[in-house]
Regions:
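Short intrinsically disordered terminal tails
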Residues: 1-10, 84, 105-108
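Short, cationic-aromatic polyanion-contact patches
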Residues: 94-108
Length: 108
């Protein structure tokens, strides 16, 4: 069984505050941009299916992020874990049977 990242409400609030500051230019970095791009990509992919889920390949997520370092394919799933911990997506299953669902609109 895979252990999912679980954040307290306080940790979620702090992380969202950080992401909003990064969005507003108060903090320099690309972390927020990567999460946002991945969320938008997943939202588009999920909208194409009847059950509202998607299961993109890791390299597809990297391309959506604008990254060409395909040897770092784990990054897509790392960012998915972060989005899930913040309650923006839900992941079910594993491997080729994994399903990703959008659970709420992005607000950072």
């Amino acid at each position: 069984m895979i252990k999912k990242k679980v954040l307290t409400q306080e940790q979620i609030s702090e992380k969202l505050d950080y992401l909003r500051k990064q969005r507003d230019g108060l903090i320099v970095g690309d972390y927020r941009n990567y999460l946002y791009k991945l969320y938008m990509y997943l939202k588009e992919r999920c909208s194409e299916t009847e059950d509202g889920s998607c299961n993109p390949y890791p390299w597809q997520m990297l391309v959506a992020l604008g990254r060409d370092d395909l040897h770092k394919s784990y990054l897509g799933y790392t960012y998915c874990d972060d989005l899930e911990a913040l309650d923006y997506i839900k992941m079910q299953g594993y491997g080729k049977d994994k399903k990703i669902f959008i659970t709420k609109e992005i607000d950072f």
